[in-house]
């Protein structure tokens, strides 16, 4: 994956996730969508940077042929990625939403379950469809 494709991939991933998670979190927590959107955007920016670094090294260690990765490797990839997010997201969620650490942990657990399936499905579909290459061909 080129640097531009990595950025495209990360931004597309985050935008689609925010479109799903912000309304769902507003329903679950009773917090305003604007507060949740601010938290979501802040964590998404952090996530985009983490995504770029994590996937750059993951591809170096496990090969860059993403289309042939097994389900087990995809699940391992997702678990490792999400683990790196937990250490930042729980304190940020608790502080910004003014909730207890335990409630932030429970909310993060829900996000983790969502993203385990979302990331696995998104990355599988992205690798099969390869939208960046198709968009480049259309624009060139």
Curated annotation (Swiss-Prot):
Annotated GO CC locations: plasma membrane
Q: Which domain of life is it from?
A: Bacteria
Q: Name one GO molecular function term.
A: antiporter activity
Under the heading Pfam families, the entry gives: BTP
- Database matches in InterPro entries: BTP_bacteria
**Residue ranges of the TM segments:** 7-27, 36-56, 79-99, 105-125
Keyword annotations: Antiport, Cell inner membrane, Cell membrane, Membrane, Transmembrane, Transmembrane helix, Transport
Its placement in the membrane is given as: Multi-pass membrane protein
**Chief place of localization:** membrane
Annotated compartments:
Cell inner membrane
Coiled-coil annotation: which residues?
Answer: none
Q: Its family?
A: Belongs to the proteobacterial antimicrobial compound efflux (PACE) (TC 2.A.117) family.
Q: What does this protein do?
A: Mediates the efflux of short-chain diamines when energized by an electrochemical gradient. Confers resistance to chlorhexidine, benzalkonium, proflavine and acriflavine. Mediates efflux of both proflavine and acriflavine via an energy-dependent mechanism.
Q: By what name is this protein known?
A: Short-chain diamines transporter
UniProt organism field: Vibrio parahaemolyticus serotype O3:K6 (strain RIMD 2210633)
């Amino acid at each position: 994956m080129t640097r531009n494709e990595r950025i495209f991939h990360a931004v597309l991933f985050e935008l689609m996730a925010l479109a799903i998670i912000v309304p769902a979190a507003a329903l679950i927590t009773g917090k305003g969508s604007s507060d949740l959107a601010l938290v979501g955007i802040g964590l998404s920016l952090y996530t985009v940077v983490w995504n770029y670094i994590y996937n750059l090294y993951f591809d170096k260690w496990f090969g860059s042929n993403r289309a042939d990765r097994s389900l087990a490797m995809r699940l391992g990839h997702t678990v490792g990625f999400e683990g790196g997010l937990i250490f930042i997201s729980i304190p940020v969620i608790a502080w910004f939403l003014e909730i207890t650490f335990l409630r932030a942990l429970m909310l993060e657990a829900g996000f983790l379950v969502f993203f385990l399936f979302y990331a696995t499905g998104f990355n599988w579909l992205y690798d099969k469809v390869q939208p960046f290459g198709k968009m480049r061909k259309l624009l060139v």
